[in-house]
Amino acid sequence: MLDVKDIFKSIPHRYPFLLVDRILEIDGNEKVVGIKNVTINDNFFQGHFPSRPVMPGVLICEAMAQVGAIFAHNARGGMTDDRVFVLTGLNNVKFKRPVEPGDQLRMELTCLKRRGSFWKMQGIATVDGKLVAQAEISAMEVELA
């Protein structure tokens, strides 16, 4: 299990764009499970939508991608100052239910393919055991200029 201090060592994201609160499980190079506790204080709810706050789908995908980056960084020994994982693709994205304040977003990513610095993962996001989103996520480790 990784807490927020460990997450800070794994990815460069910080408030307000850090969308992972905890990693519950890392199963070697196969699978990772992380959570985001969604609160009304999340800044994206200010305009999406004031009368019925809903977490934007693209941010659900970003949260899954951040969990995937933590997974990949851990598989190779942690984050370094000169390298970062970047999102290279999203495929077969589906949104099934809204994510609202008070929900705990659970994200499970499974490694589909890994070749060199390239990763392809299947991401599934749930709330209370119900599917809210799914996507194939591709990412690549790159050197910072």
Where do the language-model regions lie?
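Hydrophobic beta-strand-centered segment that forms part of the acyl-chain substrate-binding groove
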Residues: 1, 68-106, 132-134, 140
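Short aromatic-glycine motifs in intrinsically disordered, low-complexity regions
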Residues: 2-14, 81-82
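Beta-strand-rich interaction surfaces with strong enrichment in secreted/lumenal proteins
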Residues: 8, 51, 95-97
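Catalytic strand-loop segment that frames the active site of acyl-thioester-processing enzymes
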Residues: 15-55, 60
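Residues located in well-ordered beta-strands
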Residues: 19-22, 89, 94, 108-110, ...
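A residue-level signal for conserved active-site and pocket-lining positions in enzyme catalytic cores
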Residues: 23, 64, 109, 129
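HotDog/MaoC-like acyl-thioester-processing domains
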Residues: 28-29, 100-103, 110-145
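Active-site- and interface-proximal helix/loop "cap" or "latch" segments in soluble metabolic
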Residues: 55-61, 65-72
